[in-house]
């Protein structure tokens, strides 16, 4: 067997299937952009679901890819086993209703055994098949020539992830030799068993059934092939190393980590686990951030945060106590540069994100210790000897606090950890993840009606908004029909259409279809599986029939607003990169008649100054009256002139390029103005964060921008009248004068409050009672706000050397409470924060604070007196 690098194996796989007539599908972003059911792209087939479920008919039914993927369901095993990973590459070949079992099996065998390709020894390969799949069994035995003893029937060889395509599968195993297992009594030592000797290198799935919503299975109209070969596992076999981590995909990362830690890989098992965790997790984090994900407390951002924190925790075990993961990002970029050059291009931004997150986690470890101390204090106060599993899990899951550290600290305090309870919480989390995967993985059941429509339909709406055309197809109630009558809604395909189908963020055109026998309103336009524009129409008068000659007319005013906003979106995208940095990528967009919405990746907030600069740049480009040039080019030609490809989009060999002078060049299939001057005006309406590392700008152009600014001016005029400014330009001066008056009144008020507080404190000194020998003052007073209460409590503590004080005031349906405890009584166990919390709870509120001073609020003023009486009970309980 010849030695191959991982890059060679990947390219060899794609080249092989390209020779077999497959189109090479580029590796899609890890962040799904058209599949809300998925947190991450988690397999090679995940990006092809639209083909398998019939929503889209591919140009070529034969597809191959090398797809980067993320799975985190077995994160606890990563580093501890030979082949568990959170990030991996899946090589696959797929047939959408074209070839089936015979070709899939024959080509797999050729690729694995031919000296031109991998060149495995045929005698080292075994296969498994489903017990009822006699067809596959026969192919392996009769055509390929594998002896019966190396063809194993296994019940588990059936691929089914819920509703949608499913079917039997066959797996190919490579025998690595007796050094990886040679115990004749081992019940798992066989291809398909749990062992390190027989490694699965390829899984061929024969999708021949639909798993229907009612649980039944019916044959698919078109049978499909879906195969998967894990690159990391395959390379470990070819490079003849014990685990995936010794391959050239991981070892450069491990060597770089050795230099940082001063510890040697292979020196002892515990250290090796740390090296493996770090190497795996930095690959995942690097690629995910490169594809637009950012650390956060929810969704995929939470996954990144958890992976980074897990790696940092393991790094401590090999002597690394500082941020370091960011230093490994360029190493990952160098390893993967042949197939994923974008990682190296984005390395600086990825490093910035990783370093910031590492620094935060080092602070979080300290925060976790603080939380743990409170948990321990609570357990002791309740007389418990064990820290609950739920508390341990919360520390681990929310704060990233290691369980072993929790155990260590807890044992130092003479307590124990409920590890069984912790494991139960972990299992509940795993079950939630399993359920989510099952729900996310299911594909839609194939809908054959639209997929079978193959009539030609041409979009002519770039240059004209109306045309004489013919009705080619009518779909009524999911059935192909000859006509549709008044009051009915149907889907219509026209021979030529000026109506734009919703895509790329641009909304569909609206308008009318008028014929000799009736007319209909077009309310929506989507793309059918075979690419035709599918018009949703409601017939208002008469009937529309197949083969009718009709006039299709787009609503011109609406399209005019759309094109202005679409070109403005391109200008905005470029301006964002110019002002915020090249890391900015489109994360979503909406282009309608009234407004545009643009979501983009950005790590941090956008300042007012940055927003003003972005807005100014866009308007300058509008006022420069730049010509917009639209052309078609090959993808390579477009890239050569610097065309910006949108994040997560798929492009063919021929692409449409929209150039706004030399300022903005993007690949785009949408509708645009011919000159930027047509946009007129651009105004940002709002900017906000909508998720982890994703910001949103909403803006208006042209007439809508004018109306927005006119409305803002009206508000300013109203403000001028309110503050009694002579005209709008005097508003800032007038507001500043009013603010100065307010500040002076506040100072006077504070001075009066201080005097009143001193008087109040003087009168309250005489109301101190002794409870069990402890001076206590619990009193409701009037006329003081929270600041006033604090001032009075401070004054009383100065005048009374030893005292517990709780003062409350009720006003306008709210309660304010302040508690204070002198230092001598704190040493005896009295705590203002705990006391004020108890008092506030009794009048419908909450709060807390330091042992010496704390405040709280409540919502039930009528219960304040009863709540204050609790203070005396509290003092007795401590005494």
Curated annotation (Swiss-Prot):
Record's subcellular location: Cytoplasm
Protein's name in the database: Alanine--tRNA ligase
Keyword Metal-binding: yes
Pfam families, sorted: DHHA1, tRNA-synt_2c, tRNA_SAD
Residues binding Zn(2+), per UniProt: 566, 570, 668, 672
A GO biological-process term: alanyl-tRNA aminoacylation
Gene3D superfamilies found in the cross-reference section: 2.40.30.130, 3.10.310.40, 3.30.54.20, 6.10.250.550, Bira Bifunctional Protein, Domain 2, Threonyl-trna Synthetase, Chain A, domain 2
A Gene Ontology cellular-component term: cytosol
Function statement: Catalyzes the attachment of alanine to tRNA(Ala) in a two-step reaction: alanine is first activated by ATP to form Ala-AMP and then transferred to the acceptor end of tRNA(Ala). Also edits incorrectly charged Ser-tRNA(Ala) and Gly-tRNA(Ala) via its editing domain.
SMART domains on file: tRNA_SAD
UniProt GO MF annotations: alanine-tRNA ligase activity; aminoacyl-tRNA deacylase activity; ATP binding; catalytic activity, acting on a protein; transferase activity; tRNA binding; zinc ion binding
Protein EC: 6.1.1.7
Taxon lineage: Bacteria, Bacillati, Bacillota, Bacilli, Bacillales
HAMAP family: Ala_tRNA_synth_B (MF_00036_B)
Cofactor: Zn(2+)
Comment text on domains: Consists of three domains; the N-terminal catalytic domain, the editing domain and the C-terminal C-Ala domain. The editing domain removes incorrectly charged amino acids, while the C-Ala domain, along with tRNA(Ala), serves as a bridge to cooperatively bring together the editing and aminoacylation centers thus stimulating deacylation of misacylated tRNAs.
InterPro entries: aa-tRNA-synth_II/BPL/LPL, Ala-tRNA-lgiase_IIc, Ala-tRNA-ligase_IIc_anticod-bd, Ala-tRNA-synth_IIc_core, Ala-tRNA-synth_IIc_N, Ala-tRNA_ligase, Ala_tRNA_ligase_euk/bac, DHHA1_dom
Biological source species: Halalkalibacterium halodurans (strain ATCC BAA-125 / DSM 18197 / FERM 7344 / JCM 9153 / C-125)
């Amino acid at each position: 067997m010849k030695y191959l690098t991982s890059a060679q194996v990947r390219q060899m796989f794609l080249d092989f299937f390209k020779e077999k007539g497959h189109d090479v599908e580029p590796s899609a972003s890890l962040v799904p952009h058209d599949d809300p059911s998925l947190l991450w792209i988690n397999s090679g087939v995940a990006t092809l679901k639209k083909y398998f479920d019939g929503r889209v008919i591919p140009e070529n039914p034969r597809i191959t890819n090398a797809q980067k993927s993320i799975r985190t369901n077995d994160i606890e095993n990563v580093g501890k086993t030979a082949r568990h990973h959170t990030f991996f590459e899946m090589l696959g070949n797929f047939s959408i209703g074209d070839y089936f079992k015979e070709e899939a099996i024959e080509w797999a065998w050729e690729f694995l055994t031919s000296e031109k390709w991998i060149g495995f020894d045929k005698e080292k390969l075994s296969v498994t098949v489903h017990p009822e799949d006699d067809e596959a069994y026969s192919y392996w035995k009769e055509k390929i020539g594998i002896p019966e003893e190396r063809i194993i029937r296994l019940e588990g060889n059936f691929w089914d992830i819920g509703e949608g395509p499913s079917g039997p599968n066959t797996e190919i195993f490579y025998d690595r030799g007796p050094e990886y297992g040679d115990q004749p009594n081992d019940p798992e030592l066989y291809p398909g068993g749990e062992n390190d000797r027989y490694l699965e290198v390829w899984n061929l799935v024969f999708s021949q059934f639909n798993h229907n919503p009612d649980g039944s299975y019916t044959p698919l109209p078109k049978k499909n092939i879906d195969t998967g070969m894990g690159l990391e596992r395959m390379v470990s076999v070819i490079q003849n190393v014990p685990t995936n981590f010794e391959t050239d995909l991981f070892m450069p990362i491990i060597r770089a980590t050795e230099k940082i830690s001063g510890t040697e890989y292979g020196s002892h098992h515990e250290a090796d686990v740390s090296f493996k965790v770090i190497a795996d997790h930095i690959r995942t984090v690097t690629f995910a951030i490169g594809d637009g994900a950012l650390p956060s407390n929810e969704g995929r951002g939470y996954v990144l945060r958890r992976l980074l924190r897990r790696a940092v925790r393991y790094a401590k075990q090999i002597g690394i106590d500082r941020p370091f993961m960011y230093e490994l990002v360029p190493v990952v970029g160098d390893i993967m540069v042949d197939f994923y050059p974008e990682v190296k291009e984005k390395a600086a931004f990825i490093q910035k994100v990783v370093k910031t997150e590492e620094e935060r986690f080092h602070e979080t470890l300290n925060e976790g210790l603080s939380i743990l101390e409170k948990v321990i204090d609570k357990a002791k106060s309740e007389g418990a000897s064990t820290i609950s599993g739920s508390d341990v899990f919360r520390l681990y899951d929310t704060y990233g606090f290691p369980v072993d550290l929790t155990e260590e600290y807890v044992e130092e305090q003479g307590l124990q950890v409920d590890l069984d309870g912790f494991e139960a919480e972990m299992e509940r989390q795993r079950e939630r993840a399993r359920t989510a995967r099952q729900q996310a993985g299911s594909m839609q059941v194939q809908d054959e009606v639209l997929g079978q429509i193959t009539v030609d339909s041409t979009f002519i709406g770039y240059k004209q908004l109306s045309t004489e055309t013919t009705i080619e197809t009518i779909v009524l109630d999911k059935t192909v029909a000859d006509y549709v009558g008044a009051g009915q809604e149907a889907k219509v395909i026209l021979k030529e259409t000026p109506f734009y189908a919703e895509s790329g963020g641009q909304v569909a055109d609206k308008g009318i279809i008028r014929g000799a026998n009736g007319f209909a309103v077009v309310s929506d336009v989507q793309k059918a599986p075979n690419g035709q524009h599918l018009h949703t129409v409601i017939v208002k008068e008469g009937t529309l029939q197949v083969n009718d000659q009709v006039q299709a007319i787009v609503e011109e005013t609406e399209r005019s607003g759309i094109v202005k906003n679409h070109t403005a979106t391109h200008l905005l995208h470029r301006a964002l990169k110019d002002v915020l940095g090249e890391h900015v990528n489109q994360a979503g967009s909406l282009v309608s008649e009234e407004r545009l919405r643009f979501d983009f990746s950005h790590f941090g907030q956008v300042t007012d100054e940055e927003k003003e600069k972005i807005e100014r740049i866009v308007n300058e480009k509008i006022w420069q009256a730049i010509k917009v040039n639209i052309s078609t080019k090959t993808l390579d030609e477009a890239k050569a002139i610097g065309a910006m490809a949108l994040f997560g989009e798929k492009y063919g060999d021929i692409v449409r390029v929209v150039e706004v002078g030399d300022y903005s060049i993007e690949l785009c299939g949408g509708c645009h103005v011919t000159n930027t001057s047509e946009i007129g005006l651009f105004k940002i309406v709002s900017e906000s964060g909508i998720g982890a590392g994703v910001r949103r700008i909403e803006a208006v152009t042209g007439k809508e921008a004018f109306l927005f600014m006119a409305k803002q001016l009206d508000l300013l005029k109203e403000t001028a009248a309110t503050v009694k400014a002579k005209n709008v330009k005097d508003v800032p001066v007038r507001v500043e004068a009013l603010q100065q008056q307010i500040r002076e009144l506040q100072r006077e008020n504070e001075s009066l409050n201080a005097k009143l507080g001193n008087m109040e404190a003087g009168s309250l000194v005489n109301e101190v009672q002794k409870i069990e020998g402890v001076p206590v003052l619990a009193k409701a007073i009037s006329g003081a706000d929270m600041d006033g209460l604090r001032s009075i409590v401070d004054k009383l503590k100065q005048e009374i050397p030893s005292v517990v004080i709780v003062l409350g005031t009720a006003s306008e349906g709210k309660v304010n409470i302040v508690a204070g405890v002198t230092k001598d009584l704190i040493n005896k166990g009295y705590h203002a924060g705990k006391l004020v919390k108890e008092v506030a709870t009794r009048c419908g509120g909450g709060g807390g604070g330091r042992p010496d001073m704390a405040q709280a609020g409540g919502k039930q003023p009528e219960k304040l007196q009863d709540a204050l009486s609790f203070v005396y009970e509290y003092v007795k309980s401590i005494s």
